[in-house]
UniProtKB/Swiss-Prot annotation:
It comes from Trichormus variabilis (strain ATCC 29413 / PCC 7937). It is a multi-pass membrane protein. It comes from the Bacteria. Residues 1-20 are annotated as: Disordered. This is Photosystem I assembly protein Ycf4. It is found in: Cellular thylakoid membrane. One of its GO terms (biological process) is photosynthesis. InterPro entries: PSI_Ycf4_assembly. HAMAP family: Ycf4. One of its GO terms (cellular component) is plasma membrane-derived thylakoid membrane. The chain crosses the membrane at residues 38-58, 78-98. The keyword Transmembrane applies.
Length: 198
């Protein structure tokens, strides 16, 4: 599954993308399969722990799989209830992050107007919408950042005059090297700037 797709608007019918004047890249945020998976697993596990704690207190079996009424409420049932509560709080955070699509957005490069726009969704509040705009003339290069090891990092950055580097790729699982190089080369060619970091 590709997290960042590139769509050229205004392509010519014969497939030549050189006629395109707008480049739009969709960036996947927290609505990834792995986040749905972990939110579901944590919700199920935490619900089981909480129901086991409540069952040991009420001496009524609320679970299908096992009979937690045999547990002594203090300390086992109480601890299971606390674990369940903590797990449900974590699951709530994961589900809210998915609902809000944290980190999702797009990169828009328009040669007609000479502007770029980087848009991302953040946490609710006054900074919910994160927008960065600049002129295409101010772009110095497209930079590829590759760091291997236990915590690998593979990302594309836009180097803009008078600003710090602007990240263009998603946060989370790193892109493959081939995909990163292809996206970087395509963007550098579109903007007419050098590609750094290879």
């Amino acid at each position: 599954m590709t997290a960042s797709t590139t769509i050229n608007k205004g392509d010519s019918p014969n497939g030549d993308s050189s006629a395109s004047s707008v480049l739009h890249q969709k960036v996947l945020g927290s609505r990834r399969f792995s986040n749905y998976w972990w939110a579901s697993i944590v919700t199920l596990g935490a619900s089981g722990f909480l129901l086991a704690g409540i069952s040991s207190y009420l001496k009524v079996n609320l679970l299908i799989v096992t009979d937690p009424t045999q547990l002594i409420f203090v300390p086992q049932g109480l601890v299971m209830g606390l674990y369940g509560t903590a797990g449900l709080l974590l699951a709530s955070y994961l589900w809210l992050a998915i609902l809000w699509d944290l980190g999702g957005g797009y990169n828009d490069f328009n040669r007609e107007t000479g502007n770029i726009k980087i848009f991302r969704w953040g946490f609710p509040g006054k900074n919910r919408k994160i927008e960065i705009g600049s002129r295409i003339q101010d772009i110095q290069s497209v930079r590829i950042d590759i760091k291997e090891g236990l915590n690998p990092r593979r990302a594309l950055y836009l180097r803009v005059k008078g600003r710090r580097d602007i990240p263009l790729t998603r946060v989370g699982q790193p892109l493959s090297l081939a995909e990163l190089e292809t996206q970087g080369a395509q963007l550098a060619r579109f903007l007419g700037v050098p590609l750094e970091g290879l």
